[in-house]
Amino acid sequence: MARSFAQLARSAEKSSSSIAVPKEPLETAPLDIHTLGDDALRGDARRIGKVDERVRDLARDMLRSMYTASGIGLAAPQVGVHQQLLVIDLDFETPSTPPLVLINPEITTCSASVDTYEEGCLSIPGVYLDVVRPTAIQLSFRDEMGRPRTMKADGLMARCIQHEMDHLRGVLFVDRVTDAGGLKKELKDHGFLATDVRPITP
C-alpha cells in the first residue's frame, strides 16, 4: 500500500539510517550546480544498481549543496552525476524533519486533474514561470538504504517530485512553459538563452 510523505517522514524519524545533514548554508557548496546551457543537464540518468555508502554520501552532498543554494529539491544530473537520485526537502526550516531521498523513482499513476503553479529551478536561478502538471501522483522508488518504497503525493510535493524527475530525462521546467513570450523575456533578463530551451508537448 502506498504511503504518504508524512508517513514516510515519521518512519525516517524513527530510523537511525537517516542521511539528514544540518539544514544550513555552507560557505562553499560541496557540489557545483550546472545551469541552463550546460550539456550535463540534457542526458538520461542511469538507474542505480547497488545502494551503498557512496550513493548515500552523494545524497548528503546533494543536500548540503541544495541547502546552500536555498532550494527544496535537487537531482543528481544537476551536479553532473547521471544517476537516478533525487533529494527533496519542503520543510527546510524545521531541522527535525528528515529530507526525502528517491532512488530510481518511477511514477506509476498520475491524476487526471492538473493545476498550474509557478516553478523555479536551481539550474536556472532567478527564472520563475507557470507550468502545468498533474495534481497528484503515486510512485515507487528505493530509499537511501535500498529498500523498496511506494508513496502518494499531491500539491507541492507531487509537483516537486515531477520537476526533479524531469531532470533524470534531461528535461528542464522551461521546456514545459507554454508562454513563449514570457519565457523569452525571463530568460533574457537573467542572462540565459531561449535557444537552450527544448520545448516538449505537455
Swiss-Prot record:
<feature type="binding site">
    <location>
        <position position="167"/>
    </location>
    <ligand>
        <name>Fe cation</name>
    </ligand>
</feature>
<comment type="function">
    <text>Removes the formyl group from the N-terminal Met of newly synthesized proteins. Requires at least a dipeptide for an efficient rate of reaction. N-terminal L-methionine is a prerequisite for activity but the enzyme has broad specificity at other positions.</text>
</comment>
<comment type="similarity">
    <text>Belongs to the polypeptide deformylase family.</text>
</comment>
<feature type="binding site">
    <location>
        <position position="121"/>
    </location>
    <ligand>
        <name>Fe cation</name>
    </ligand>
</feature>
<feature type="active site">
    <location>
        <position position="164"/>
    </location>
</feature>
<keyword id="KW-0408">Iron</keyword>
<keyword id="KW-0479">Metal-binding</keyword>
<dbReference type="InterPro" id="IPR036821">
    <property type="entry name" value="Peptide_deformylase_sf"/>
</dbReference>
<dbReference type="InterPro" id="IPR023635">
    <property type="entry name" value="Peptide_deformylase"/>
</dbReference>
<dbReference type="GO" id="GO:0043686">
    <property type="term" value="P:co-translational protein modification"/>
</dbReference>
<protein>
    <recommendedName>
        <fullName>Peptide deformylase</fullName>
        <ecNumber>3.5.1.88</ecNumber>
    </recommendedName>
</protein>
<dbReference type="Pfam" id="PF01327">
    <property type="entry name" value="Pep_deformylase"/>
</dbReference>
<keyword id="KW-0378">Hydrolase</keyword>
<dbReference type="GO" id="GO:0042586">
    <property type="term" value="F:peptide deformylase activity"/>
</dbReference>
<dbReference type="GO" id="GO:0006412">
    <property type="term" value="P:translation"/>
</dbReference>
<dbReference type="GO" id="GO:0046872">
    <property type="term" value="F:metal ion binding"/>
</dbReference>
<keyword id="KW-0648">Protein biosynthesis</keyword>
<feature type="binding site">
    <location>
        <position position="163"/>
    </location>
    <ligand>
        <name>Fe cation</name>
    </ligand>
</feature>
